[in-house]
């Protein structure tokens, strides 16, 4: 990862840091690539499934009625599949409560953003 790329911590609604954004790529706390963010702030898994959107805070949210995207897109692969996360991150800002029918993906459904080697909805090797 180049030194010019800024890592933005992504928080849960509880205030825990659970991911990093090195735009447009998302990485988990261990530094593994877990997703991609479009210019419209839509979040996709490494397997190309729609997961939700990047809200202010920042945090990753989705509507319960949307579900996990069955339609897939081809997302660009980062130059580096892994980053070295920093040892310390800033405290989470105060975030508004979620409205009814909206969930925090990293808090309630983190399995929607698996690393590239994992995930139930990845393509078969056959």
Model regions and ranges:
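N-terminal leader/targeting segments and the first structural element of proteins
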Residues: 1-34
């Amino acid at each position: 990862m180049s030194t010019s790329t800024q890592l933005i911590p992504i928080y849960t609604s509880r205030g825990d840091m659970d991911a990093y954004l090195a735009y447009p790529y998302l990485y988990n706390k261990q530094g593994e690539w877990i997703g991609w963010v479009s210019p419209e702030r839509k979040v996709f898994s490494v397997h190309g499934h729609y997961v939700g959107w990047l809200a202010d805070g920042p945090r990753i949210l989705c509507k319960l009625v949307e579900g996990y995207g069955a339609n897939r897109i081809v997302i660009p692969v980062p130059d580096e599949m892994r980053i070295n996360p920093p040892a310390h991150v800033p405290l989470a800002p105060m975030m508004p409560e979620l409205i009814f029918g909206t969930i925090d993906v990293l808090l309630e459904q983190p399995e929607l953003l698996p690393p590239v080697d994992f995930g139930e909805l990845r393509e078969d090797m056959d």
